[in-house]
Amino acid sequence: MAIEQMTMPQLGESVTEGTISKWLVAPGDKVNKYDPIAEVMTDKVNAEVPSSFTGTITELVGEEGQTLQVGEMICKIETEGANPAEQKQEQPAASEAAENPVAKSAGAADQPNKKRYSPAVLRLAGEHGIDLDQVTGTGAGGRITRKDIQRLIETGGVQEQNPEELKTAAPAPKSASKPEPKEETSYPASAAGDKEIPVTGVRKAIASNMKRSKTEIPHAWTMMEVDVTNMVAYRNSIKDSFKKTEGFNLTFFAFFVKAVAQALKEFPQMNSMWAGDKIIQKKDINISIAVATEDSLFVPVIKNADEKTIKGIAKDITGLAKKVRDGKLTADDMQGGTFTVNNTGSFGSVQSMGIINYPQAAILQVESIVKRPVVMDNGMIAVRDMVNLCLSLDHRVLDGLVCGRFLGRVKQILESIDEKTSVY
């Protein structure tokens, strides 16, 4: 018998922490290796955490709603067949490393994750004048965790700095702490009966990314009206037989995504990203699509959308939306997007100005398809199915001319869809 420790896994390349949203096991439950034991929410994705061992759950260390750093223990599992002697021999080495976080090893300096610090680590280090370059982390990949800093403070390791270092470091915390009171006073206070909702996981990431996008990217907007009467008639005529044959819905959105992917191939400038002293024009056309839940927004990616048929895109939309609803979305599902298409029409919007999905250069809002009287080329008035396409663009990367031509091409593709168009 041996007691094994399960730690918070790294559910994505840049993920530093995770929040336990739900335990799927309880103390005393028997689990097999790879059985899901918890649902964890990060700023990138919701995912089930599988057990690394076969055995019996002895203790749930993390609580539901608690945020833990990658590498921190979440539970203990009693296993069979392990050698207790080996387990005991390993423990002193681990505890010795934990008790001496100040000691800087040559190996730790080479670890790629060492320079990635969480906000909690940066705050504690700033408050106590700790040089993070002199701290060896005990987290995954040598990452410095909040516990490393707290342990250093508790053991008095901070005072090992010489007086000159302390003099230099002393002003930093004061200047760093000056803006904090101003920032705190700008937030509204809760009154009796108000409900406070902690900002964690996906909502925290949305807030951070949207703020970064809005403050860093000079947004500009343009809109174009499209007549999709023939597309609507064609889709409605085949949707039932398509569902019966394929097993999933043929949505209007699939036609829009396909049209955008085709136009991006013809206007590669739209498939670009700002990178400081250069603009990166992406080779792959990976369409990010916004999928909302009751309290969150996810942006999974349809990879190589330009190479897929309308049917293939419809299948991806259905599959990714289901993954979001079931909480099965992976980090890979969210990575690699080069252009975002948002189906704002699904909740009745007719005009909107989207915030660009950083670091992409544009986002297209597909609004509601509505019947409107339209003056035709022959001067007659007819009722047509019309939709507004609203484009937000990064004016560092894109100008009105190329965006207008791009939207015009999307419009042309959509208005040319009829009964001769193949969805396969």
Curated annotation (Swiss-Prot):
UniProt GO BP: glycolytic process; tricarboxylic acid cycle
Top-level EC class as recorded in UniProt: transferase
Region ranges (Disordered): 82-115, 154-193
Tagged with keyword Acyltransferase: yes
Top-rank lineage group of the source organism: Bacteria
Active site: 395, 399
Annotated Pfam families: 2-oxoacid_dh (PF00198), Biotin_lipoyl (PF00364), E3_binding (PF02817)
Enzyme Commission (EC) number: 2.3.1.168
Function text: The branched-chain alpha-keto dehydrogenase complex catalyzes the overall conversion of alpha-keto acids to acyl-CoA and CO(2). It contains multiple copies of three enzymatic components: branched-chain alpha-keto acid decarboxylase (E1), lipoamide acyltransferase (E2) and lipoamide dehydrogenase (E3).
Entries under PANTHER family matching the protein: DIHYDROLIPOAMIDE ACETYLTRANSFERASE COMPONENT OF PYRUVATE DEHYDROGENASE COMPLEX, LIPOAMIDE ACYLTRANSFERASE COMPONENT OF BRANCHED-CHAIN ALPHA-KETO ACID DEHYDROGENASE COMPLEX, MITOCHONDRIAL
Protein name (database record): Lipoamide acyltransferase component of branched-chain alpha-keto acid dehydrogenase complex
Gene source species: Bacillus subtilis (strain 168)
